[in-house]
Amino acid sequence: MVACGNDAPLPEGLDAKIVEEHCKEVTRRYGLYRDTWVKEASPFIQNLKPAGLPTTVVYPFGGGDLISALTTYPEAKEITTMSLEHAGDPRRIKGIAAKQLKASLQMIRATSSGLLVANDSKTENLMKGQRGEIPGQLSFFLMALAVHGYEPVSLKYLKTNADGSIRYLTQTELTDLEKKEAKLLNKVWVAPDFSEAFDNLELIAVKKGGDPVKDRIVHRHFAQNLDDDHFGKDDGMKNYLKARTPIVAMTKAASYLLWRDAFSTIRNYLLDNMVFMVSDSTGIPPKFATKAGFVQEAWGKFNQSFLGASADYNADFVKLWKDAKPLSFRYGYLDKGLSKHMLITKKAPAAK
């Protein structure tokens, strides 16, 4: 209903006219996204990839952004996103009044516009989706599947065990956790108004008309504060990620957190386990990438970080972008001068 990905009957009691109006506008935006960003960015990035890359993607700071992950890695079979945002409770839509349904769908259109129009999602929009009748994160994920021609076939909520294995929540657990609200993961964020049972999800989807096995993708999203004081002490999450190696990675619009010492655990995980990464300037600074055996290729223009960040790393990036080739599309943040830019970080060729 929110993603308008098929013609399945609406839940009983929902106003079909309101949903029809919503889907008309959303479908229009899907078309624009496919005709602009997907057609331009996806083949460009594909041409930069070496053969034989892993099909397992890890996207830290990827709140709501499955759509860009599928554009960047259309060959992916498994995608893990992690961010401060919780997945959300889908059950509240049942029996919602027409007035509230209209307002909720308007909110989803407004908060998803950054991803669909500007290939970027503002923090404020991600926060808004943490409260209300329609869960923002889940909605964005379903919209991403619709844009890329996938149909969801399974939705489960989960937690990680200490060894990194996955434990799916049972109906009994969902009921038992009903009144235990999800934890606020950052004091400046908006607190979720739903149960902690809906922190993390697993979505399985299949390409429309495709083979249920060969054309299947698994997406897992984890509500996670990725700083060293939280992610750094979460053995279950760290072991889950280690079990996925080797991986390809991406990040964008990540507030330059990978530049900071307080996020060294997630940065080191990427450097130890990835073979290829696509990012904007919020990716990994050359100081760390070069030491770990990576080479970096810059595209577009970069003169200064969009947000305040390390002067030394800014200087390193200015050098890296000095002779960069042009970039015609936006990939995450613009720089301080509103220039488009993109960074490829890949394992250096083995010495002969």
What is each residue range found by the language model?
Residues 1-112, 195, 202, 207-352:
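Non-globular targeting/processing and membrane-anchoring segments
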Residues 63-74, 90, 114-142:
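Short, thiol/selenol-centered motifs that function as redox-active sites or metal-ligating centers
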Residues 79-128, 153-183:
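Thiol-based oxidoreductase modules, predominantly thioredoxin-like and allied folds used
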Residues 143-148, 152-228:
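Active-site/pore-lining binding-face segments in mid-to-C-terminal subdomains
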